[in-house]
Amino acid sequence: MSVSGFKRIALLAPLVAVMALSGVRVFTQEDVQPVNDGPNPYRPIRNWGILPEGRQWGPVSGIDIDRDGKSVWVFDRCGNSCAGSNLDPVLKFDESGKLLKSFGAGMFAWPHSVHVDRDGNVWVVDARLTTPAELKKFPGETVKGNTVVKFSPEGKVLMTLGKSGVSGDPPAAFTDPNDVVTAPNGDIYVSESHTNLESTPNAVARISIFDKNGKFIRSFGKLGSGPGEFRTPHAMVFDSRGRLIVADRANHRIQIVDKNDGKFLGEFRDFSRVSGLVIDKDDTIFAIDSESDAKRHPGWRKGIRIGSLRDGKVKFFIPGHQTDSPDGAAGEGVARDAAGNLYTAETTVRGVTKYVKN
């Protein structure tokens, strides 16, 4: 039996037509057996990337590849957060791990994701506000966060979406944004929110679209587990057909929606509780699960699941890191360079891991 060769049972009535049109099967969570094994064609290189002397990695969740196909951009949390820090959180490394440039000191509260657009500009997401505890710990610090910032490759601020230090609704503000991605036509997509759903039952869960100049177009999505609903839309990418692929993390699925209005097109559940995504030109999907454990997703292991977006089947599995915790650890962000190497942004073991094909 293949790693995805388990019995599947489709959802009933209203989704059948959608499934037929999209060519994507839809399943309930209970129908899917854990996919925890498979060939692993990669070997890990831990602690990749050389920081200046005296600086240590913080938790990292944002990582992407430069337009050159080999340099790596990382969005580091300056320790545990960037409150009170004078460190640059936006870092660029060459393919050997040498630090080429850095910028962004004093601008962010809690760095979360980074996206490099087709012109080489660097977009970053500051995912929450500075906390009262951080303000108390660092006198003179101000409330920051809840913004999406577009930098030139040299570090010049080109655009800011949302108002730093404010929570709210687009277009004026964001509430705990997760990710940003740009469409082929330059439209900007921002997903919210990263809120703890157990303590915030009425959290927002939406994706907003802005045009290339930052003008608000529309938002779609709401909190829920049905078609077109989200529970922590943690990461987004576009596939070769221009569909928006969403890591609907707390719903334990990858959801496929129309990029214009969020119409549900399909879902896959074999990739587990996905925090980060990358898709290659052949629609091979690399999905990293940083959170599965006995409480949040029983029976599933942390790691990277690799498969086809065309059929939703997992073909390869890279297990998470061994740690003192029985559940181990895996990163939140994942990126793939032109040579096929993978890079993961590590929140638990910190820093960056590079995966090279054997």
Annotate the PLM regions.
Residues 1-13:
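Bacterial N-terminal signal peptides that target proteins for export
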Residues 12-22:
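Bacterial N-terminal signal peptides
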Residues 22-358:
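Eukaryotic scaffold repeat domains enriched in small/polar residues
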